[in-house]
Structures are given as C-alpha cells and as structure tokens.
Swiss-Prot record:
The active site is at D65 (proton acceptor). This is Uracil-DNA glycosylase. It comes from Clostridium botulinum (strain Eklund 17B / Type B). The gene is ung. One of its GO terms (cellular component) is cytoplasm. It catalyses: Hydrolyzes single-stranded DNA or mismatched double-stranded DNA and polynucleotides, releasing free uracil. InterPro entries: UDG_fam1, Ura-DNA_Glyclase_AS, Uracil-DNA_glycosylase-like, Uracil-DNA_glycosylase-like_sf. Belongs to the uracil-DNA glycosylase (UDG) superfamily. UNG family. Excises uracil residues from the DNA which can arise as a result of misincorporation of dUMP residues by DNA polymerase or due to deamination of cytosine. GO terms for molecular function: uracil DNA N-glycosylase activity. GO terms for biological process: base-excision repair, AP site formation via deaminated base removal. PROSITE patterns: U_DNA_GLYCOSYLASE.
C-alpha cells in the first residue's frame, strides 16, 4: 500500500493509506469503479501529488472535485486532458490571467506546465461519479486532503495558497503557519466570477510573494497545443 506515491509525499502522508478511514474509502471506491463510471481513471487519482513533489510545492490551487464529463478529469484541479474543450471556470481563469499579466488564452485546458513548476493542483475530493458533481464528497477524501494541507502547513519554506470559492476558503483554518500566504476570492465559475474573481489579480500577487521569498516566479502561460 505504501508504494502508491512514488516521490517524497510518501514520507509525509504514506501512513494515511493504512488508516481505517482510507481502507474503508478504498473498499468503497473499488466497488464504485467496478459498477459505475468514475472519474478520473483510477491510475490518475493522485496525479497532483505525482506531478508536484512535497519539497517542490510553491503554490496550492484548491479545487472542489473532479470534472464529471467524459475524458475531462486527469487528477489536477481545474485542468482537463488535451483535446477536451476548456471548461467555463478555467476559461474565466484564463481571462483573469490575460487581464492580470497579459497571457494569451490558449486552445487547451491542460495545466501540467503549472504542476511541473510547483503549483499543486489539488481537489479536496479526488473522485466523482460520471455526471454527478460532488457525488463522492462524503466517502472520506476530505480527511485525506485535509491532512495534505496540514502537512504543507508545517513546512518551513513558504507556500502561496490560492482559495477560490467557499469550499476552498473553508480550508483556511488549516493554514495557521504565518510563513505562508493566502489569496482568496469568489470562485471563477460563471455563476460568481463577476462578483470579485475578475480583477482579483491572483497570479501577479502570487509571483510577487514568490519573488519576495526568493523563489522563481511561475510562468503562468499555458501554450497552444
């Protein structure tokens, strides 16, 4: 069980996989994957952790749960697989990115470039039933992802936490280390973006924090594929 995570995350949260809540979650998930269509593919569930090692995390962008349409989710919050239409929330993120720091709006929603630079794209719930948003919110994932946030909170090297929407902002209480930075606003969803997401400048603010902490800023431009 302890070999699920292949990088340094294993040292920090590897023991979660042995805990009762996780064993119950795993059993539940095995049944769900067997009998229903679940996203993402089971081999992609932990991609956020695989792509961004614990020691490499500079920024955390918290999402809610995976996209629930075909071929969209691949384990990174807000990101979709190449070749899939950019979802509305991500399109709004791109619009803010353009207004904030001048990035052009790309023809895809594949955010692995961010993950490779130290942006942990973490959903608070890591799986979902096809077509049923939030269908896995009560099966134990929140315990697991809360513990990820708690262990990041203990880190000496500062992290920028980007919290969009009430679901993410509720996690602010887990971030108690004064070394870290918190940027928060309403969610980029079309339902709320015009009430304070547009114009919030999270990307330039993040890079300002990173520069002040002597870290290399993030190159936020996602290129056309």
């Amino acid at each position: 069980m302890n070999n699920i995570l292949k990088n340094d995350w294993n040292n920090y949260i590897g023991n979660e996989f042995e805990k009762d809540y996780y064993l119950k979650l795993r059993k539940n998930l095995a049944q769900e994957y067997k009998t229903k269509t679940i996203y993402p593919d089971m081999y992609n569930i932990f991609n956020a952790l695989h792509y961004t090692a614990f020691d490499d995390v500079k920024v955390v962008i918290l999402g809610q749960d995976p996209y629930h349409g075909p071929n969209q989710a691949h384990g990174l919050s807000f990101s979709v697989n190449p070749g899939v239409r950019t979802p509305p929330s991500l399109l709004n993120i791109y619009k803010e990115l353009k207004d904030d720091i001048g990035c052009y709006i790309p023809n895809n929603g594949y955010l692995k470039k961010w993950a490779d630079q130290g942006v942990l794209l973490l959903n608070t719930v890591l799986t979902v039933r096809a077509g049923e948003a939030n269908s896995h919110k009560n099966i134990g994932w929140q315990i697991f992802t809360d513990n990820i946030i708690k262990v990041l909170n203990t880190r000496e090297k500062p992290i920028v936490f980007i919290l969009w929407g009430n679901n993410a902002i509720r996690k602010e209480e887990l971030i108690t280390n004064p070394k870290h930075h918190i940027i928060k606003s309403v969610h980029p969803s079309p339902l709320s973006a015009s009430r304070g997401f547009f114009g919030s400048k999270p990307f330039s603010k993040t890079n300002e924090f990173l520069k002040n902490d002597n870290e290399i800023p993030i190159d936020w431009q996602i290129e056309n594929l």
